[in-house]
Amino acid sequence: MIDSLNNYNYDVNDSLKVENLTTEDYEEICKRLGRKPNRTELGMFGVMWSEHCCYRNSKPLLANFPTTGKNVLVGPGENAGVIDVGNDQKLVFKIESHNHPSAIEPFQGAATGVGGILRDIFTMGARPIAVLNSLRFGNLDKSSNISLLRGVVSGISHYGNCVGVPTVGGEIYFDDSYSGNPLVNVMALGLLETDEIVCSGAKEVGYPVLYVGNTTGKDGVGGASFASSELNTNSLDNRPAVQVGDPFIEKSLIEACLDAFKTGDVIAAQDMGAAGLTCSSAEMAANGGLGISINLDLVPARENDMTAYQYLLSESQERMLLVVKEEKLNILIEQFKKWGLFANVIGEVISKKEVIISQKNQIVAQIPTSALSDETPINIHKVIKEPPDYLQKKWKWSEDELPIITNNKILSFKDKKQYSLSEIILNLLSNPSIASKSWIYKQYDSQVQSNTVFKPGEADAALLRLRAQDERNKNNNFSGVAASVDCNSRWVLLDPYRGSIAAVAESARNVSCVGAEPLAITNNLNFSSPNTEIGYWQLSSACDGISKACIALETPVTGGNVSLYNESKNKNNQVTPIYPTPVIGMVGKIQNVDKAVSSGWKNINDQIWLIGSYRSESSIGGSSYLDYFHGLITGRPPKINLQDEKYCQTFLRDAISKNYISSSHDISDGGLAIALSECCILSSKGANIQLEEKNARKDNILFSEGGSRIIFSLNKMEETNFLNFVSINNKNFGSNIYVKKIGFVSEANLTINVQDEELCNLRVDELAEKFNNSISNSF
């Protein structure tokens, strides 16, 4: 075989810019190879040493996450995390981002984001059972943001609906910081019932490497490097870096792979996602402690004139790399072909710890696996010791700086007009970040597979029956899995540490609100450039907050994704970073889905109760009220006492399991008034609320935000049993937790009284009109 490794006919400086590599990187590559890299090899290093693939800026921070626990079977490092959910079932889950591709091709960017995360799930041997998403867009007063929203939602619904996996929930927020750089994070869940988890390490020398799925084209070339750089006015030129997906091939790939995995004849599996064939082959070899040899002439190609560089860096979708038992090879190939998929042997596992690539009888790349995958460079950043001055000034803000409330009216700093408290409630309900997302949910098939317990928006978390796929496990299993994705980006902007603690706490709280016990998280860290002092400080502080909350709540991190350089440049080179957005994907288990509760009231005259912590703060600093009504993003987010947070959630779950509670809803964006409004809207019933707060501003009572607060309802016939339950738990929780009755479910109006003074009296149909039509009315 002819060696073409010494073909250096390229401009080094220009090529380094294309690959997002530095001069220091180039020198290190030369040192590791013992020679200069050729152009193909440089491209391979470019994608493998990108932030997207090797976490070169964030790896030291991620190392501090708690990753082990009683239920964790597979933690970070594999395609997805795996936890034990009992009954011989395992839950596989992960979250990923497709931010940059969605910014320039919203439909395909979002669609392939769904396809990619689904492959991460079934690559582990699990059947995908659900998808959730966390989305961020600029405000809807700009037509470009509306176009992005429409495109992304269409892409998600198209791919998920066609592949037959329900989209069961999520969150969406709007802010101008995302106008040039939307966020598209997709979380997927899968159910695994086989004894063995399929991993990615190629551990048997001489075994064939099987390419399965779609053909390889030029779409997505350099996608990993593109995802690791900032967006600018020239980013539309990167449309070829966006992949094009085919959900019908994905569906065939799911079924064919799951059938193949059941045979036990597949030794290892890896999705060809970010960095394509380069990443899948290098990681497969490195994870197995061996090497791999690939012949590009055997790769099914969509086009005839593809170079080695294009083959290796293509991110064409619906492709898998498998290591299989040689004696079962032909049977497996026929099995894949039955599903209309390509199935070609393109190489083998070798003992020499190198990735060796050949094309047209020439070696076009030969790189030690450790150089590509294991010993990737780490960028060392100094973390500033004190929070930035501008934040410290914001933290000194006090609600006393707001206008005085007179006759239940207050002046808005935003438009200098007087509004009643009732008008403010309606105003907040029309905020697209708070308002109903039904226009979006209606485009998703949330019921396919028939395991969805609550429709999107009905409960604080998605809930699915863990209905066994395997006949051996069909033993009257009534258990279910709950999932939620959460992040209050405004809080993280104002205090990355507290804001990230709050994101973990809220995601756990949402899971608890349906009656499920939080078990583990996956996270998607969406941040701006780590090369600025503030950018890296935000990332570092957020990771510290996530770690602290996960330890306290006993919800280990099983994996996730880091998406940096989320910022946009305008024509004048002015940089607009996104709000730091560490999205938390929480999963939990409920023993009996029949006991789960949703958010809306159930019966007229049911009692309404509030549980909370005296030690967890609530304030209007950093609140939706302060932002949307007054136009102020200031103050310090309230501190959450994590011990009390855990107590409140445990109390609630226990009460739900004993059938005391009829409905449950956490208090988050918009505060108590908005939480009550949402319960009324979902049930088409009113609420009569009597509060006894003293010495507090009325807007604080209605709109303050914080942790550890949940409203719930119960049938008045259960009051005696419930009070006995409260008394028993008070001995365990002490005097730091309060549980108090605040009202009852009524027929048609939401009425809130404080010290016998009526603050608002609104018809439920008024509330619903504002809440349900806000997003659709923006178009």
From Swiss-Prot:
Annotated substrate binding sites: 97-100, 119, 243, 315-317, 563
> What GO terms describe the biological role, i.e. biological process, of this protein?
'de novo' IMP biosynthetic process
Pathway(s) this gene product operates in, as recorded in its UniProt entry: Purine metabolism; IMP biosynthesis via de novo pathway; 5-amino-1-(5-phospho-D-ribosyl)imidazole from N(2)-formyl-N(1)-(5-phospho-D-ribosyl)glycinamide: step 1/2
Q: Which residues does ATP bind?
A: 55, 94, 523, 560
Its Enzyme Commission number?
6.3.5.3
Q: Which family does it belong to?
A: Belongs to the FGAMS family.
What biological function has been recorded for the protein in this entry?
Part of the phosphoribosylformylglycinamidine synthase complex involved in the purines biosynthetic pathway. Catalyzes the ATP-dependent conversion of formylglycinamide ribonucleotide (FGAR) and glutamine to yield formylglycinamidine ribonucleotide (FGAM) and glutamate. The FGAM synthase complex is composed of three subunits. PurQ produces an ammonia molecule by converting glutamine to glutamate. PurL transfers the ammonia molecule to FGAR to form FGAM in an ATP-dependent manner.
Q: What is this protein called?
A: Phosphoribosylformylglycinamidine synthase subunit PurL
Source species? Prochlorococcus marinus (strain MIT 9515)
